[in-house]
Structures are given as structure tokens and as C-alpha cells.
């Protein structure tokens, strides 16, 4: 039976976890690390690099390296690489494919199913696009769940026997969410219900990094007169240095940034050597921190809960390691945030638990999530008429009857929106469809029943029915990406083809490594056996030289032929070694017993 995994597809890093014996375990990647950078690069020879290998070469391959793609998921953003345009789904699928491969390598069996997490405040387009990315990667996406919900699931199951409120403060690399969850306990069963959620999909650790970058560029311009902002390679180096400085400032009061040869002027190379203090960093990012307060207060207001009712505060996302963030949470809640969870891993652990629940491996928990934004349709005057309010538990289904605005109106256009504003022009348009064939009648007489159905993934299905004629029309919101099933199928096929290419490339590398090892062994064999006749040595050396040339030329067929030939001549040489040893009296083996001198007994 194939396995199901939980995946935290993050802006900066991604993590995969699995249930083993009913307990979640984070899987280390092929490089031995428990987190994988969400970075994809296309090398000059056509190889696709993902994770640490992609991140390490970013400075020398800026134009073909993509990071933080999660910030574009569900939009029409594309990245031109060579003669091909890549969508956020395709880039995300590369990351998911690596996590899938690493999990399969660890488990020793196929991984087909996955629960993938998204920020709680992701809209329908972003959720649908994430699901598509999973499909392109060859995964059956069992469920899309919210990151704070997953974190609460991982954290809340082992917390006592009482009903408790858990506040999850999730500040990742590119998104921010706050969720309030209620954990209900009943003997050996837990119910985790989201009471309210809020957030900002354009706020994350990347924004803190950018403030350091801007400061460095400005400071360098003032001190040297050199503007680095148009130098792509310099900016990539600044980006990496800024991220590192941010991390250092979580535990130190200052960080030194040294970047030799950052630029070249008429006078020669220019170096960067500067220090940023934690106080400076917190001052330049205080407005970003301020933006986290309103979502926190909105959640308490939505749930009708006072702050003193919160039992636990959980910090999620690597950005919560910044002292200013944890201090703010402590001030706002009056509680010390829990330090017992790994903010980088807890979301993937929760996703693995949910995968176990959906596969029947865990039967002790029920997860009830909510829709983060209100859903409705446009009515006369551009009014946003809500059918499903935000923070409604999902899955859910709601219907409402509308009528025509004009006499003898033959059709109605159903425009679906998501958001909290009063006018549709200020909300997110999810799609439009027509209900035709309405019988001629005075305005206000026809009855058009509009139904919204949100599934457990938070993905929206809408239908409209003329109650008079029985005519019905429906649509599933396919996301802002607008990918058709044919396009998704094409991308899946391309991903499969690429997987085969990767497999062949790895096989060629393995073959080359094996050939180099064989050359080393054969050369050592000659060196260790000087007494073997010269003819045998010459024959083996000729095959060694031939294989070396094939390796140098990187010719797959020549390496294979050369390896086979060297193996045969190596065996022949070994036979000559044996014959030489047999003829040499000094090398002959003497059979004897070992005698114990103390007892005189033989052994």
C-alpha cells in the first residue's frame, strides 16, 4: 500500500512528514536536512536544481533561479526560462516532486497521497493553484488545510484533557496568519475547531530581509557613491547576506556584513564591510511588526473571546524567532509563547497527522476548519451580497433566492466574489457564468436559487437554478491561474518526462563515479603488484587510459564500453597476479598450527 505524507509548502522552506506507527516523523531530505529551501534553478546544461543545490548557485545564476514563488501562486505571474514560460504551479511542483522523491527514498515505497498546507488567509485561487501544483508533481492531494490549523493539530493533541483555546501566530517567509482554535477533549478523542482566522498574505520574513537590503544599498551609495540596485549579482549577494544577518540578530545584538568585491569601479574593486545592530533592525521594521496587530485583534473580535481566555500561544514559522515578534505576542496576549514546538516543522507534522486521519491511520481526532473570507455574488449596483460569511466552518453549503432586475430578462450573469468589502469592485473576482433560458416575466417575478458549496479543501462550487423552468448552470472556481484540465495534464506529463530525465542524469553520474572508482582500483592493483609480467601491465594500463579518456569526454556509451573492458582486463590481470604468487617460493603459504607457549597445547 502506498504512503501518504504531510507537506508544508513554504515561501522560504518546505518540510515533509509522515506517520510511522501512528506517530508523526519529519523526513530528512537527500542532503540530510529536515527543511528544504523553496528554491528552483535551471542550470545552463538544462538540469533542474531544487533546494540547497539551487540556493547555493543563485549568485552565479541569478536570472534562472526562482525563490519565494509561493507569493505568486494563484496569479497570472510567469517566469521566462529560455524559450519556455513557467507558472507558479509548475515551479511549486518541482519543490513538491523533490519532497516526494526524498520521502520515497526514506520510506522505500511509493508516495501517492498528500495533505498540503496553505496560509489560512489564502483565497480560492491560491488554494486551487496549490492543489494543481500537487497534481503536477504526481500527488493525489487528499486535502488542503490551513497552516495554523495544522500547527494546532500537532500541538493540541497532547495537551491535557480539558477543552482549551489555542492561539496560533504564524509568520512565515511570505505570509502571515493568526488563528484561534478550540481543542475539545472527550476521553481518547479530540475535536479541533477553528473559531476564527485572519491574516496578511503579503507580509513575511522576506519583507524584513528587504528592509536590510534597502538599508545596505542606501548606506553603500552614501559611503562609496556606487549604486548596487541595478546589479543583479550584487543584489543576490545582498539578499543572502541580509537573510543571514536577520538570523544572527535573533540571538546577537549586532551582525557584521562583509562582502568582498561587491562592485567594481574605475579605481578597482569595492568591498562592503558594515555592521547592523538589533536596535537599528527593529527600528527599520517597526511598521511591519505593527501590521501583525490588527489581524490578531480581529480574530479575538470575530470569535467573541477575551485575551485572558487563551490557554496556549503557539508561534509558527521561522520569522517568529525574531525577538521583536515574540515580545509583541507576549505583550498582546499577556502569555509567554510556547517554546516546545519547532516553528519550522510543526505545520508539516500537523499535515502528516491529518493525512493519517484521512487514511484511517488515526481515529482519535476530528478537524473542523473555516473559510477565511466571505463569499457572495454581485447584485444590482455592484453590491457584494454575501452568501457565506468568513469564519464559517467547512465543508458548508448555503442557498439564497434572487430575482431579475429587468422585465423579460432572458438570462442572468452570476459573478462570484470573495472578500469583506461592501462593493464587488473592491473584492476578488473568482469567476462568472451565465444562467440562460429564463421564461419572459416582469422583473422581480422569476426565482433564481444560487447555491454556494465549499468543500473540505476550501474550494468553491457555485450553481444557479431557475425554479420556474428548472434550468440549471454551475461552475467550480478554478482559481486565478485559469489553468484548464488540459494544461494541468500537460504539465503533469512534462513533470513525468522531467523525472525520467533526472533519473537518466543520475544514472549517468552514478556510472561515471563507478568508472572513476574502477580506474583508481585498477591503478592501485598495478602499483601493488610490481612483479607481474610487463605485458599484463601494459594491457591493463591501456584499458585504464581508454576509460580515463571516455570519462574526460563524458561520453555515456564510451564509459559503459570502457568499464566493461576494464573489468575483463582487471580479472585477467588478477589471474596473472595469482600465477606470479604461486611461482614465487617466498610467497607460498605454509600450513601450521599455532602453539600456546604457556601450555604447550595446540589450537
From Swiss-Prot:
Q: Where is the composition biased (Basic and acidic residues)?
A: 580-589
Pfam family of the protein (one): HSP70
Q: Where is this region: Disordered?
A: 578-603
Q: Which Gene3D superfamilies match?
A: 1.20.1270.10, 3.30.420.40, Actin, Chain A, domain 4 (3.90.640.10), Substrate Binding Domain Of DNAk, Chain A, domain 1 (2.60.34.10)
- State a single Gene Ontology molecular function: ATP binding
What name appears for this protein in its UniProt entry?
Answer: Chaperone protein DnaK
InterPro entries in the record, alphabetically? ATPase_NBD (IPR043129), Chaperone_DnaK (IPR012725), Heat_shock_70_CS (IPR018181), HSP70_C_sf (IPR029048), HSP70_peptide-bd_sf (IPR029047), Hsp_70_fam (IPR013126)
Induction trigger: By stress conditions e.g. heat shock.
Q: Which UniProt keywords apply?
A: ATP-binding, Chaperone, Nucleotide-binding, Phosphoprotein, Stress response
The similarity comment for this entry is: Belongs to the heat shock protein 70 family.
> What is the purpose of this protein?
Acts as a chaperone.
The stretch of residues making up the signal peptide is none
Amino acid at each position: 500500500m502506498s504512503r501518504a505524507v504531510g507537506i508544508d509548502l513554504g515561501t522560504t522552506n518546505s518540510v515533509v512528514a509522515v506517520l510511522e506507527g501512528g506517530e508523526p516523523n519529519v523526513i530528512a531530505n537527500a542532503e540530510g536536512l529536515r527543511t528544504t529551501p523553496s528554491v528552483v534553478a535551471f542550470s545552463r546544461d538544462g538540469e533542474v536544481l531544487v533546494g540547497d543545490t539551487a540556493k547555493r548557485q543563485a549568485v552565479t545564476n541569478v536570472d534562472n533561479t526562482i525563490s519565494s514563488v509561493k507569493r505568486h501562486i494563484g496569479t497570472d505571474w510567469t517566469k521566462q526560462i529560455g524559450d519556455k514560460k513557467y507558472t507558479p504551479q509548475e515551479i511549486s511542483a518541482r519543490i513538491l516532486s523533490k519532497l516526494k522523491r526524498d520521502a520515497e527514498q526514506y520510506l522505500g515505497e511509493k508516495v501517492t497521497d498528500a495533505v498540503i498546507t496553505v496560509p489560512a488567509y489564502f483565497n480560492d485561487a491560491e488554494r486551487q493553484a496549490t492543489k494543481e501544483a500537487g497534481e503536477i508533481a504526481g500527488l493525489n492531494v487528499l486535502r488542503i488545510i490551513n497552516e495554523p490549523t495544522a500547527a494546532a493539530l500537532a500541538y493540541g493533541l497532547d495537551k491535557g484533557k480539558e477543552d482549551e483555546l489555542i492561539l496560533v501566530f504564524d509568520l512565515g517567509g511570505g505570509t502571515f496568519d493568526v488563528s484561534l482554535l478550540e481543542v475539545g477533549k472527550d476521553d481518547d478523542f479530540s475535536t479541533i475547531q477553528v473559531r476564527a482566522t485572519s491574516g496578511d498574505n503579503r507580509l513575511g520574513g522576506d519583507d524584513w530581509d528587504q528592509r536590510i537590503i534597502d538599508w545596505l544599498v542606501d548606506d553603500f551609495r552614501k559611503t562609496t557613491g556606487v549604486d548596487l540596485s541595478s546589479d543583479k549579482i550584487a543584489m543576490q549577494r545582498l539578499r543572502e547576506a541580509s537573510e543571514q544577518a536577520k538570523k544572527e540578530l535573533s540571538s546577537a545584538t549586532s551582525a557584521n556584513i562583509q562582502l568582498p568585491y561587491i562592485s567594481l569601479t574605475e579605481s578597482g574593486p569595492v568591498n562592503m564591510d558594515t555592521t547592523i545592530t538589533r536596535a537599528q533592525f527593529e527600528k527599520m521594521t517597526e511598521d511591519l511588526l505593527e501590521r501583525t496587530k490588527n489581524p490578531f485583534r480581529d480574530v479575538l473580535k470575530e470569535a467573541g473571546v477575551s485575551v485572558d481566555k487563551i490557554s496556549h500561544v503557539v508561534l509558527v514559522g521561522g520569522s517568529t524567532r525574531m525577538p521583536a515578534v515574540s515580545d509583541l505576542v507576549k505583550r498582546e496576549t499577556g502569555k509567554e509563547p510556547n517554546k516546545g514546538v519547532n516553528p519550522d516543522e510543526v505545520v508539516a507534522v500537523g499535515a502528516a497527522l491529518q493525512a493519517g486521519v484521512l487514511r484511517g491511520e488515526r481515529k482519535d481526532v476530528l478537524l473542523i476548519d473555516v473559510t477565511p473570507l466571505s463569499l457572495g455574488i454581485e447584485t444590482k449596483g455592484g453590491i457584494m451580497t454575501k452568501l457565506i460569511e468568513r469564519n464559517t466552518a467547512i465543508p458548508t453549503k448555503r442557498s439564497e433566492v434572487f430575482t431579475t432586475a429587468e422585465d423579460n430578462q432572458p438570462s442572468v450573469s452570476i459573478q462570484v466574489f470573495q472578500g469583506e468589502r461592501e462593493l464587488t469592485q473592491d473584492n476578488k473576482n473568482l469567476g462568472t457564468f451565465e444562467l440562460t433560458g429564463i421564461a419572459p416575466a416582469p422583473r422581480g417575478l422569476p426565482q433564481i436559487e444560487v447555491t454556494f458549496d465549499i468543500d473540505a479543501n476550501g474550494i468553491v462550487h457555485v450553481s444557479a437554478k431557475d425554479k420556474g423552468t428548472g434550468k440549471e448552470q454551475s461552475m467550480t472556481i478554478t482559481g486565478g491561474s485559469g489553468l484548464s484540465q488540459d494544461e494541468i495534464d500537460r504539465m503533469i506529463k512534462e513533470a513525468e518526462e522531467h523525472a525520467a530525465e533526472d533519473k537518466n542524469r543520475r544514472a549517468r553520474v552514478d556510472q561515471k563515479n563507478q568508472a572513476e572508482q574502477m580506474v583508481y582500483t585498477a591503478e592501485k592493483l598495478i602499483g601493488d603488484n610490481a612483479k607481474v609480467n610487463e605485458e599484463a601491465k601494459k594491457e591493463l594500463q591501456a584499458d585504464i587510459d581508454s576509460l580515463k579518456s571516455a570519462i574526460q569526454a563524458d561520453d555515456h556509451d564510451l564509459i559503459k564500453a570502457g568499464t566493461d573492458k576494464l573489468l575483463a582486463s582487471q580479472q585477467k590481470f588478477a589471474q596473472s597476479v595469482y600465477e606470479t604468487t604461486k611461482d614465487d617460493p617466498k610467497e607460498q603459504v605454509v600450513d601450521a598450527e599455532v602453539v600456546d607457549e604457556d601450555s604447550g597445547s595446540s589450537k
